[in-house]
Amino acid sequence: FPAGVLNMVQGEGDIGARLTTHVDVNCVIFTGSFATGRRIREATFDQPHKKVCLELGGKNPAVVLDDADLDQATREILLGALLTTGQRCTATSRVIATAGIADALKRRLMEALIRIKPSDPFDAHCFIGPLASESARERFFHLLKQAKAEGAEPWIESVPMSGGAFVTPSIYGVSGEEP
């Protein structure tokens, strides 16, 4: 590749395995699970020329404190969560808010979210498009079902839409000390 070119390759484990072991790949950056990160570290251990950056195990929280501008926090949370329809490892997937502003932030997030309608990604006004595939949509609803089984409370539930892998966005909440 020409100097200064960044290539982003997304895919499953077989693609990652080939990239991490290929001698012409001089840098690997990965965001995801500890298990996969461990495999990447092991695969690149004997390649001292290769730079490796691993961001492992996080759930990409937005932390909102009492002195926050709640309108800006709402915009940034929704952008972080819904950019690329939330289909990236770094998508904001949880919000931690102090007790003093939690209810007001929840209200703002819910009011903003119900106004967001998934649409054609080629539409200039599109904020959220479809999921990548029907199987991604099935997995999405499986994860929501699992979240409810683990105690998450649906504040706004997603519903499937017609015309592709579209779903309405959702917010689930968990109260208490442990997010």
Show where each model-derived region lies:
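ALDH superfamily catalytic-core signature
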Residues: 21-22, 27, 34-178
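PLP-dependent aminotransferase-like
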Residues: 1-16
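Residues that line or immediately flank small-molecule/substrate-binding pockets and catalytic motifs
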Residues: 10-13, 32, 99
